């Protein structure tokens, strides 16, 4: 969280991949603008609904909607009014509605924009998967032998 500018410097120095997502965005409006100017995405979790998170709502309002994503960060960061319970995908509409209310737009319109943005970043279920960037985080090319689940 305290390394926002450091990560931008690193990405600028080594070269950012085609798609950069700031997972569970926690920066302020100025940092949000910096990220968006580079064409990167800001993904907001349930924290944007928290009473004390005006800085996140300001960041949300500071960037073009084409740079926005939404996430659960499950099982953490459950949106208000369900804080204290495990987060899950079924609670995402609460986050989207709160985002839409803050932006002064219709939740369905924002949901459509978020869905479109998500497909641009990750592809969709009907298409071939979006290629992962090469490097240590690329998906394995051979199956991984996992131990069986259950008591040890």
Language-model regions: role of each:
Residues 91-152:
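Mid-to-C-terminal alpha-helical segments outside catalytic/metal-binding sites
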Residues 35, 68-70, 81, 107, ...:
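Bulky hydrophobic/aromatic packing residues
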Residues 66, 72-74, 88-96:
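Active-site gating loops and adjacent loop-to-helix segments of metal-dependent hydrolytic enzymes
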Residues 1-38, 50-54, 58-59, 63, ...:
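Divalent metal-binding pocket/active-site signature
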Residues 20-22, 42-44, 68-72:
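Hydrophobic faces of well-ordered beta-strands that scaffold small-molecule active sites
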Residues 16, 65-68, 127:
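Generic structural signal for secondary-structure transition and capping sites
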């Amino acid at each position: 969280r305290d390394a926002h500018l450091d990560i931008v410097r690193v990405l600028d120095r080594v070269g950012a991949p085609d798609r950069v997502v700031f997972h569970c965005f926690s920066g302020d409006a100025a940092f949000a603008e910096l990220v968006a100017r580079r064409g990167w995405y800001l993904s907001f979790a349930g924290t944007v609904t928290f009473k004390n998170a005006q800085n996140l709502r300001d960041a949300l309002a500071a960037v073009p909607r084409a740079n926005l994503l939404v996430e659960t960060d499950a099982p953490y960061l459950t949106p208000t009014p369900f804080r204290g319970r495990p987060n899950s995908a079924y609670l995402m509409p609460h986050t989207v509605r709160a985002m839409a209310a803050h932006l002064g737009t219709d939740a369905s319109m924002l949901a459509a924009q978020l869905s479109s943005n998500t497909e641009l970043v990750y592809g969709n279920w009907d298409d071939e998967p979006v290629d992962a960037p090469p490097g240590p985080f690329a998906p394995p090319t051979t199956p991984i032998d996992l131990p069986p689940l259950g008591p040890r």
